[in-house]
Amino acid sequence: MVLVSSKKLYYNPLNISFLPILTVSPMQIVFSPEKVARVLLWIVAFLTIANTLGQISHHFFGHSRLFGMVYLFNLNREWSVPSFYASFAVLFCSLLLTLIAWVHHRREEVDFKYWYGMAVIFLLLAIDEYTDIHNRIFEPVRSYLKAIGLISYAWLLVYVPLLLVIALIYRRFLARLPKPTIKLFVLAGVVYLVGAIGINLIGDQYTYQERDALSYSVFYTLEELCEMLGIIMFIYALLKYMEGYIGRLALVFLDREK
């Protein structure tokens, strides 16, 4: 089983000489941008509904466990089904970015470094999605800002400068991308940041001391939903870019030549 493009260029990207010669069978799974996005949207819908039902059970009926199901599908918990999905989705972005970078590198195009850079960024984001490292690192910052009355500005003070630096580094690269790709990238980024910074900012302002309140559940559900939708849009944008400028991605099942 190998990853190839729709141009049907079957090769050994690792250049390992002892691999047997392979012939192509008709079995393949094509990563259509529309179909991938549709599947991911159904998954996100299921996770959001499961989380919402769990919070209704907790806040309105006093059942906060339900055999561990409330925690298992909580969008705001580590080591839960939603955190596993979110980490996988971001990791998939990193994989797609790596494949795009590798192709551009093979073509000796200068922008491959930017694609590799994004792949590394999304790999780190995938690790953070599952482990929630950023909250542990920045908790002292949040505590200090709370003490001086600036808790509602915690995310702005930490993340906006970082985003500005990344935007400054990538501005020329983004300008060279096809216009449809730019639009999709911007839309995905806006939706993601509305959740990661916007809703998070509002949630910190109103619910910092009320982590068990219903309002906090509403805020983090909206936050995580925006982040997941933003990632789906980004995956769709990457697959559309690959489809138009590299080739449609597919998993092809190959038979050994007899």
Language-model features: locations:
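Alpha-helical transmembrane segments of multi-pass integral membrane proteins
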Residues: 43, 114-122, 179-204
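Alpha-helical transmembrane segments of multi-pass membrane proteins
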Residues: 45-64
